[in-house]
Design a protein with these regions (language model features):
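Anionic-ligand binding patches
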Residues: 2-6, 12-210
Length: 210
């Protein structure tokens, strides 16, 4: 089994999620050295898979011989025809549709993103506020894509935030299966139920086969 995976992100929330999901498998999770000073990859893909794969390939060149995993994730709201989608990280940016492509890890404020979703869902009844979190992980080594892994979590978008444990859209995303928002989950619960946890389990299965 591959015992070490480097995660291409400077987002501490994502690193916590990965570490929590990997702990039961005995997999060491690390960040890329000096990642914060690395120029961001331009995310110009039309799908989560496109963006995750591109990031993994480019960032894996920074750590020769290592398995590097990058993710692209976001929220799809059915009443908004799948938005924010691949634009989730910067949905509140005023120039969202005026400047393409955009750079990874230059996210606008989470609260502003949430506020835009709430504004666009104003008046939408609860039964039509369905949506899902999507996470795609891409693994690469030495600039070559190895595989991708998709995880999803179905839920309901609330009309006000709840909880303080999460990041991004977590406070708005209500998960009926356990009666909590993702921002109310413990690290263990999030590893079990989240879209990122689902994708990571597929990654772990791939590691086991390797």
């Amino acid at each position: 089994m591959r015992r070490r995976i480097l995660i291409a992100t400077s987002n501490p929330g994502k690193l916590r999620d990965f570490a929590g999901a990997a702990a039961p498998h005995g997999i060491e999770i690390g960040g890329l050295p000096n990642f914060s000073s690395v120029p961001p990859v331009v995310e110009d893909g039309l799908t989560f898979e496109d963006n995750a794969r591109k990031k993994a390939e480019e960032y894996s060149r920074l750590a020769p011989g290592e398995i590097v995993v990058a993710d692209d994730s976001g929220l799809e709201v059915d009443a908004l025809e799948g938005a924010p989608g691949v634009h989730s990280a910067r949905y509140a940016a005023p120039d969202l549709y005026d400047r393409q492509p955009y750079e990874a890890e230059t996210n606008t404020d989470d609260q502003a993103n949430n506020a835009r979703v709430l504004r666009e869902l104003k008046g939408v009844p609860p039964e039509k506020r369905t949506g899902r979190f999507v996470c795609v992980l891409a693994a690469a080594r030495d600039g070559r894509s190895l595989s991708t892994f998709r995880g999803t979590a179905e839920g309901i978008i609330l009309d006000a935030p709840r909880g303080t444990n999460g990041f991004g859209y977590d406070p708005l995303f209500y998960f009926p299966q356990i009666g909590k928002t993702f921002a109310q989950l413990s690290a263990e619960e999030k590893a079990e139920y989240s879209h990122r946890g689902a994708a990571f389990r597929k990654l772990m299965e791939w590691c086991d086969r390797g």
